[in-house]
Amino acid sequence: MVYQLVPFQKRAFQNGSFQNCVVSLLSGGALFSFLLSIFFVLFLLTPVRAGELPKFFTYLKAVDPSILQEMRYYGSHNFLGRRVKGYKAAECILTMPAARALKKVQKRLRPKGLSLKVYDCYRPQRAVNDFIAWAKKPTDIKTKAEFYPTLKKSKLFGLGYIARRSTHSRGSTVDLTIVPLPPKTQPEHNPSKQTACFEEVDSRYKDNSLDFGTGYDCFHEKSHTKSRVVLDARKNRDLLV
């Protein structure tokens, strides 16, 4: 599902698991987008001291430390099976408006005993390039059993599960889910015991989020917005949107 802050609009979900809820900043229309693109080029070319962020960017924990973080691409539990290039820390970095928007959602969820959990936020272009390079290696299928068991790697871009240009690289997009509080301890991921991400909740990897019908980054039709999922998963999807 795609959320655009200004104006608000919903579109059909096209890439990855339904848990990938995308927040994009479109204030000011095309001119703003053009200027923001220029800013990101300068951001990538300008040296920044360790721990220092460019203006208009923030660590999510500085805006709302109660939002849980599980930065999948910094670790190995992702469809590459290793840390993705460009990720230097397990930190969610966003534009300030996007971070504040998440804080507002979190404020509504907490009284219900729920919390947001983010999986990915700002995504360096190096990471996108890493995805592209990975897709060109047909023999590297060590994560296929969990993340894309019914598809060939060569189909992932054409079907929209992975994008060659990611809105994450603008810092205004976030992959997230909803977790019951207090959060349960997740089992350590064992790559030698993979189960398909579209299996029933008791069979696939036991993420501590609500059941949305699939695991995170599930490249399968069951992750599509209008796919048929069990009633509880459908209710959770409705809550997320």
Regions inferred by a protein language model and the residue ranges of each:
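Residue-identity detector for glycine
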Residues: G16, G28-G29, G51
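Bacterial N-terminal signal peptides
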Residues: G28-L44
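Extracytoplasmic cell-surface/polysaccharide-interacting catalytic and binding patches
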Residues: P47-C121, V128-V241
